[in-house]
Amino acid sequence: MLEEHPEKKIFVLDTLSCSGALAGAAELANKLIGEDQTFDDICFALKKFADSTHILFALASFDNLAKNGRVNRVVGFIAGRLNMRVLGRRTPDGKIDFYFKTRGETRVLAKILEQMDEDKYDGVHPVLISECGNQNAAQLLHHALRPSGPALR
């Protein structure tokens, strides 16, 4: 593309993240572009945003972890049958840390709220909730966060 359009500027942002953080970065980029910010200012703001995000995710299915070799297939099958849930987070270097295991949806959602408290979530920054096949859990989390007042999307 640069060969055909050398006047174009390209910035590649590695968020070391997924899901809501990517949506948040896209929203921020769109907002800053709409405000006619300079290219360099937009790049700086996006990098700062990526460095400040926190990612927590809960898994109820171990199928994909088993398929890509992160867990043994038998272990994944048994964990699913036992209604196991794992809570994961992004480490500063972008790796996945599965740091909490429990049985049942309620316990893992409670741990998400507890972790947000431990991370000193201020209730000011938006919380982006995304789900894949578990809208009920997303709604429960949404309602649990509602009293604290963050912008929820």
How would you name each of these model-derived features?
Residues 1-11, 17-27, 31-153:
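Mixed-charge interfacial surface used for oligomerization/domain docking
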